[in-house]
Amino acid sequence: MNSIEKKQLLGLDLNQMEEFLLGLEEPRFRGRQVYKWIYQKECSSFYEMSDLPRSLRKKLDEKARVSIPRVLKQRVGKDGSRKFLMELDDKKKIECVLLPQSRDKKSSYTLCLSTQVGCPIACSFCATGQSGFQRNLKAFEIIGQYLGSKKELSKRLKSPRAELISNVVYMGMGEPLLNYDEVIKSVHMLNDPRGINLGQRRITISTSGEVAGIKKLAQENIQLTLAISLHACDNSLRDQLIPLNRKYPLEVLFPAIEDYIAFTGRRVTFEYLLLDEVNMSRNDANKMVKLLKPLLANLNLIPYNEIEGLPFKKPETAKIWQFYQWLQDGGLNVSIREERGSDINAACGQLRSDYRR
């Protein structure tokens, strides 16, 4: 039996895993054992599953596979950030990033996951969209980024600690809510207490404003954080920066956000890239205060990370703090995101499906 015909076990939930083992004429508890080996120990080799009978390991090797994406290359930034170039079964390539929670390089990490190969949104400031869109990722490929990153991190830091990755953000390559079903499936897999056991409130899904997905997410009863990539507070500018705004302009997007907050009771995070001489005027600040002040919301300001071939520039520090002060004076709950990973092109908007530097 070749690898194409083998059953992909990565991506199965516990019930599905147990049913698969029952189909191999094995007791149900063997499914629980295999499930733990995959999701708690990042194990992709059946022969390393030491508490399984040798005969079962051989049977699994003949009939199943666990395809954790292969790490082709890793880059480590000065701040301890780690960017992984990973290869999928069909040779497509994606990137994901581990960001340290603090600069001591000994803390836990936030993992930034990709959900698509490329991105169809084609935001004008973003490296990912410049490469075009190829396909959606399956849930097992999304979870595989978590398992592959954690395995690599544990190996390099020589630490098996389960808490090495304490938070997950769906902010890598792609628009998560355009791959809705697979993303939500991966969220449930991350959260499963019998497997990875990552708390729902440690998970963030970021969207450029996919209103249909926001409406569906409000019905899921998942206590995650929704982040909105805003970047402009009027339609004319946002149309230029985020083409999706032409489908879902602000007067459509914000009622959906208000409904989401009302239905879930969860605070929404807004992300705002600071683009020098583009979206940082006093008028921009006033518009943002008017939009966000009525909402249960946090605002993260993100100084732009410059990308070769794109015209946008990072603002000077004084301009950043002036804009911050206007927003704070307007009564917003605002913070400036500390830069992570920019020296290895791993910061916001810098991910591609290859290494160009």
From Swiss-Prot:
Keyword Thylakoid in annotation: no
GO cellular component, one term: cytoplasm
GO biological process entries: rRNA base methylation; tRNA methylation
EC number, as in UniProt: 2.1.1.192
Keyword Electron transport: no
First-level EC class: transferase
GO molecular function, one term: rRNA (adenine(2503)-C2-)-methyltransferase activity
Cofactor: [4Fe-4S] cluster
Residues annotated as catalytic: 95, 348
Keywords tagged on the record: 4Fe-4S, Cytoplasm, Disulfide bond, Iron, Iron-sulfur, Metal-binding, Methyltransferase, rRNA processing, S-adenosyl-L-methionine, Transferase, tRNA processing
Reactions catalysed: adenosine(2503) in 23S rRNA + 2 reduced [2Fe-2S]-[ferredoxin] + 2 S-adenosyl-L-methionine = 2-methyladenosine(2503) in 23S rRNA + 5'-deoxyadenosine + L-methionine + 2 oxidized [2Fe-2S]-[ferredoxin] + S-adenosyl-L-homocysteine; adenosine(37) in tRNA + 2 reduced [2Fe-2S]-[ferredoxin] + 2 S-adenosyl-L-methionine = 2-methyladenosine(37) in tRNA + 5'-deoxyadenosine + L-methionine + 2 oxidized [2Fe-2S]-[ferredoxin] + S-adenosyl-L-homocysteine
InterPro entries, sorted: Aldolase_TIM, Methyltransferase_A, RlmN_N, RNA_MTrfase_RlmN, rRNA_lsu_MTrfase_RlmN/Cfr, rSAM
Main subcellular localisation: cytoplasm
Domain Radical SAM core: 105-343
Family: Belongs to the radical SAM superfamily. RlmN family.
HAMAP family: RNA_methyltr_RlmN
Protein's recorded name: Probable dual-specificity RNA methyltransferase RlmN
Organism in which the protein naturally occurs: Syntrophomonas wolfei subsp. wolfei (strain DSM 2245B / Goettingen)
Organism placement in taxonomy: Bacteria, Bacillati, Bacillota, Clostridia, Eubacteriales
